[in-house]
């Protein structure tokens, strides 16, 4: 998108869906992402005349609620928009964050998105740059060392694993 000079809402909204699909194809799931991005852009133009700055004038709670009303935007995407685009101090919880925390026993396996997010926000200063960097580091550790098959022996967080190894989900009851 950067190479095609399409980083503005106006430029993206003017594209036909097929054009946008081709541009974001390398990101994977391009058809679904195209629909969701178009839903966001349509909302932005219908309610805020295409102005992200006007949308971002809303308080964080209201902005998050409005983002969650858009078809295809869930908590992780809404919080990513809040943190990375609107520069709001809200912690993003993704698969890697969950996996790293739960395997180290730092949070219960049953913890949902809101519980994990509240854990971070209760223990870190509300600083968007800190949240951004912390999340990026967890994603990196998760991607490189804590995938579906863990590589604990190489992980920089290995020394903080429980003595008996990674925590696993409780057994499913019949």
Please name every model-derived segment.
Residues 1-173:
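Catalytic cores of DNA base-excision repair glycosylases
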């Amino acid at each position: 998108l950067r190479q095609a000079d399409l980083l503005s809402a106006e430029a993206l909204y003017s594209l036909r869906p097929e054009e946008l699909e081709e541009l974001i194809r390398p990101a994977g799931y391009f058809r679904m992402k195209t629909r969701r991005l178009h839903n966001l852009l349509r909302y932005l133009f219908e309610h805020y005349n295409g102005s992200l700055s006007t949308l971002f004038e809303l308080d964080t709670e209201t902005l998050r609620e409005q983002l969650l009303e858009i078809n295809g935007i869930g908590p992780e995407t809404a919080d990513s928009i809040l943190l990375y685009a609107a520069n709001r101090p809200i912690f993003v919880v993704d698969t890697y964050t969950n996996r790293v925390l739960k395997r180290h026993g730092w949070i219960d396996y049953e913890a949902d998105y809101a519980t994990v997010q509240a854990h971070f926000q209760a223990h870190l200063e509300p600083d968007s740059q800190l949240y951004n960097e912390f999340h990026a580091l967890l994603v990196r550790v998760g991607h490189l060392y804590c995938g579906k098959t863990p590589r604990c022996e190489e992980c920089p967080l290995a020394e903080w694993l429980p003595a008996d190894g990674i925590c696993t989900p409780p057994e499913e009851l019949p």
